[in-house]
Amino acid sequence: MKIHLDKSLPGGNIAVPSSKSYTIRGLIAAAQANGQSHIISPLIADDTLATRQVLSGLGININTDTGSESWEITGNTFKAPSGNLFCRESAATLRFMSAVCARLPFECHLLAGHSLMRRPMLPLIQALHQLGIEIETRGNTTVINGQVITRSKVSLPGNISSQYVSALMLMAPACTHGLEIHLATPPASLPYLKMTKQTLGSFGIKVHSSIDWQEISIPPQPYLPARYRVEGDWSSASSFLALGAIAAPVFISNLDTDSFQADRIMIKFLAEMGAEIESGQNWVKVNPKPLSGINADLTHSIDLLPALAVAAACAKGQSILSGVRQARIKESNRIRAVSQGLSAMGINIIEEDDRLIIEGGQPKGAEIDSFGDHRIAMAFGILGSVVGETHISDAECVTKTYPDFWKNLESLGGKVTQDV
């Protein structure tokens, strides 16, 4: 699907969807608890439905009759799957469930979607090998021969993806002797490890971590059933936060300003650029002001790259977005996708190994390739609605995390039409 955006000045009120990261973590924790848990206000999108589908294929009963407000999970009813378990394009589902399947006493085949096949799994596979697990990748399939895990020490790099570490944390309580996880390098995206620890705590799991988070210890212990409420998603909010900074005031509800989510830092970056930020209990308002360039380190908030780059393109002066190397191994090579998109819109941009240098200017409409990446589509959807005459390919990719994105943009006054 291709979207056409005419020039407009979108602004107004919007409620962002629930957090993908917290929904997936909550589902997997609830699946391992004895008894019934409730996930309140889950995100319903491709990635979370992938996790739900995989868990259902493993025998976990997830009752969704209550609709979108609550899912009821009866945990610890795992059984050998009757077929392949499809993870769609969800890296979190593939990585987290690879670890969970490793501690189940049967063979599992996890299938990856097309773009997910390109994303690295080796550090997690090597970590599971250290624990005695037989796991290998065959084309788009990860084959796991699970077993009772009696080894308790594992080491892996922390600087490639926090998801490998979170995967081990989610499986650790069910290991015979728990797990002691050593990170050979400082962790990237540290807030995501804190989110995993927070979720585990909600289900009764005690986690011990060193100050630098390079040593994590989780004793063997049972998951306890819980009522687990999912907060709003700061990553999904980031494009609309950028919109408020470059177009018209935007009021966003369902955002916890005390959240552990890494991408909460977006409002700090926008404030440093000159935007006016107001906030209260569960809401943020961004008012546009003349923006200046920024030096921003995105090491722990890599998903902000597209949205912050769009704001930088509209700012006066140069912006340097550093710590972005790992953006190359997301749903697309986001460094290349952002660079190509902004260049097509007339913005001077220099692409380096670990940073982007953006000279702010006056973007113009262009043909934008989203590369099937939801965050690229959303960020350029915002910019395209402000400058007009913009076409975005594969625009349906937003269903990965934000199915109502285009509808919400229209509700704010964006002129969005689907090309036929």
From Swiss-Prot:
CDD domains: EPSP_synthase (cd01556). The active site is at 303 (proton acceptor). Its EC number is 2.5.1.19. Phosphoenolpyruvate binds at residues 20, 119, 163, 334, 375, 400. Keywords: Amino-acid biosynthesis, Aromatic amino acid biosynthesis, Cytoplasm, Transferase. 3-phosphoshikimate binds at residues 20-21, 25, 161-163, 189, 303, 326, 330. Belongs to the EPSP synthase family. Catalyzes the transfer of the enolpyruvyl moiety of phosphoenolpyruvate (PEP) to the 5-hydroxyl of shikimate-3-phosphate (S3P) to produce enolpyruvyl shikimate-3-phosphate and inorganic phosphate. This is 3-phosphoshikimate 1-carboxyvinyltransferase. It comes from Dehalococcoides mccartyi (strain ATCC BAA-2100 / JCM 16839 / KCTC 5957 / BAV1). The lineage of its organism: Bacteria, Bacillati, Chloroflexota, Dehalococcoidia, Dehalococcoidales. The gene is aroA.
